[in-house]
Amino acid sequence: MTNMAEDKTSISKVHSEFSNSSNTTGSEEESRSHQESFDGESSSGESKSKSKLNLEYSADIEPLKFRMTKTNNTNDKLKYSNNGNATDSFMRLKEHLQRGNTLNSNLRVNEFYPFNSIDTEQFENYLREPKYIKMLKRRKNLKQFRRLFLAQELMAYEGETVTSTSKSSEPTSKAIWSTKFSRDGKFMATGSKDGKIRIWKVIGSPVERAELDSSAESNKEARAKSMRIKQQVSSLNNPKEKQFLDSATEKYEEKEKLLNLYAPVFHPTPLRLYKEHVQDVLDINWSKNNFILSASMDKTVKLWHPDRKNSLKTFIHPDFVTCVEFHPTDDRFFISGCLDHKCRLWSILDDEVSFEYDCQDLITSVTLSPEEGKYTIIGTFNGYVHILMTRGLTPVSSFHVADRQTQEQNAHVMVTETDSKIRHGPRVTGLQAFRSQLDNSFRLVVTSNDSRIRIFDLEQRKLLEVLKGFHSGSSQHKAQLSIWHGQPIVVNSSDDHWVYGWRLKSSDRENDQDEPKRKPKGLARSGSLRSIFSKSMSRSSSQNNEEKPHHHLKLTNLLPLPHHSNDHYIKNTDYISFHAHNAPVTCVSIAPPETSKTLSLSNDVICELSLEFFQTSDSFDVLSRSNDDGIMSDVESSLGYNSKPGSISNASATSAIPDVVDAIGTILISTDNVGTIRVFRADMPSVIRKRVLLKLEEYNREVRRRFNSSDSLHSLSRSFNSRAKSNLAGQPAAAYTNTGKGYATGRGYSNICPKSSTSLKTLGSNAQPRTPRESMSSIFSNAHGPTTPTSAMNLPIRCNVCNGSRFEAFSGANDQQDRNYYCVDCGTVVNNFR
């Protein structure tokens, strides 16, 4: 085979070889996708054109933000930030980090810092009519794609306006080619066409979230101040321009006035920015110890670590390095794939190649078998898949993704050595190996540039399923498989600006039950295949059954020839998709469970509300319902319960405790070829949202009742002019209890009816209302406690934290004037200065 890499004279020439090489194996869909524009008809044969779909399912969306009420606490934060006093900083963090204290054995108070100043009217309107991403569904719905909204948009190129047009799909220098999460879920790395690598950090603590909000607020203040300075300078020269700038400044300040993201995932600026690569970064991989490998078109692989500002090592290759992957159990070794046809096993400590294998084709993708990394799988430019033993890189088997005859040859035959016919395309652009949860078989996800995703059983050398719907175009799309409550979900990017998702039918138990009806066709082929299939055919059959030559004689007379025995694969077009970008989407990733666990430690709004308003009866109700479109199906999707027989869920039928991963919900990351990174999240289930809304409505009625009552004016005015500085007074914090299956809150909202005396239970402890238009903090900090004779609304002194009215003096205080009191319900100290 001629080495195509030797003929290239420039980077653009090789890029054109990758993007313009056609598939000659008879794939009509690929040629259509290359010829038609994004404004033409979609390959799925829908009646609407893609341009009409793009208008109906618009990608012109903004991250969900809420208007922030600038309270005294906000002013104090800015004052503390300006003073820089250590005591003030301590007090500021203390206010943010007081997670709660115990009221009694059944009640708990929590402070949610993101709620401290969210405008209740805007939040209430959102809860009534949330605006989610509009989905295009084909027959079935994926639970992981329900209630998606744009949570965050990361600007990799700060200070530059990202523009895109649907008429041109040419990638810019800002195009992002690779996106990978670290194994601990705390970081995400992106590699760009301009050779830059960015490390993004997941918000992992309340301190980080508090600093994030303060930083965003300071930046908005700085931008507004800059505009005012420009306005003053220009007014000296041109009075008319001053009037125009005054109007522009007012509009800007009104638009940008303290808007905070509803549920961010990452810090807005990269933790690290590496610029050592001089050409495109094509692939990125993380090790178990958070080391990073990057493969580039500058013919190098570089080793990084987020704790270091520069690369640790550089590994030189003779040609473009298209793919790289760490050994899953020993990160002293890694595999690289190069355009010189060679796959190399490198020793990082020795800084040398330990083994190499020449596959006689351009290597475009590589992966290792899960868990132990025993096998190395290579994908090539012309559509071949090579399976090697990782130790020594010795060949085991190979086949062509589009040629079933090569797939059914002897398992130990390398088709490139025995085939006189050289097949061209489709190009393999992505590989991912996984273990089936049905039979623990070794399976492979193959993405190719003929707009197909193929699922292979490598042990049986059998094509199981083909996923259709996305448009490959010229990008190196890599489908990602994620196991979500026992169900394999595949997501992929597309050149038509959309994101696609499928549920694997080949992994369904109902489809697996039909397999024995199709497997006799393979049994009639030969004794060797009979032994391969015997385990999945019948566990009770003995070895003597293999020697019966006429066992399936009648069936084989009705079947096609042996080389067509692989015809019965599943054609899966039941995808769900949404218009994610205004430019070709290059990467799509679902955040791993470790990311959700990290995010749950930062007082995430969705997680906190889902756990707080989750009721014990939810789990049993959900498990007893069928998978319909009712209210409980939303809880089913968010909290991980599945009513189908044989389904696997993180929450057992006897457990009433949701897992934090289920409470966080789906986190989906997508990138495009103009440098935009969008973070989509699943909102809280509808039943949780309705309970929160009921809580807000109940609170508003209570506020109106208070303002109409003259007896409570003194207590209201006192709460408006005071600021809570809670002292837990030795009371233990009511954090989540780790039960092994999830995190349980100290109580559930079983009584949310307004008639209940304990229905207004507080969720916050640290903010006070300042106007009749309340902030979110006042909802969860000024709710009343149990209605007893000593807690009537007409008492002049009430606790700023729990709104209780029972106080006792500290023992040992003799002076009546200097005596300090504390709230019996929550332990908050009340002294003369308050």
UniProtKB/Swiss-Prot annotation:
Extra remark: Present with 538 molecules/cell in log phase SD medium.
* Protein name as it appears in the record: WD repeat-containing protein YMR102C
Annotated source species: Saccharomyces cerevisiae (strain ATCC 204508 / S288c)
Its GO biological process terms? sterol transport
Feature: compositional bias, Basic and acidic residues: 1-16, 213-224
Q: Which Gene3D superfamilies match?
A: YVTN repeat-like/Quinoprotein amine dehydrogenase (2.130.10.10)
> Which of the residues bear the PTM Phosphoserine?
S528
Q: Which UniProt keywords apply?
A: Phosphoprotein, Repeat, WD repeat
